[in-house]
Amino acid sequence: MMRLVIILIVLLLISFSAY
């Protein structure tokens, strides 16, 4: 369960930095 949350946060950070 925790891994899914971490993956989602990482994806959000990547999308923000790409933005």
Swiss-Prot record:
Disruption phenotype: None seen. An isbC overproducing strain cannot be made in the absence of the sibC gene. Induction: The sibC sRNA prevents the toxic effects of IbsC overproduction, either by destabilizing the transcript and/or preventing its translation. Expression of the proteinaceous toxin is controlled by antisense sRNA SibC. GO terms for biological process: programmed cell death. The keyword Kinase does not apply. Signal peptide: none annotated. It comes from the Bacteria. Keywords: Toxin-antitoxin system. InterPro entries: Toxin_Ibs. Part of the SIBc repeat region (formerly known as QUAD1c), encoded on the opposite strand from the sibC (formerly known as rygC) RNA. Belongs to the Ibs toxic protein family. This is Small toxic protein IbsC. It comes from Escherichia coli (strain K12).
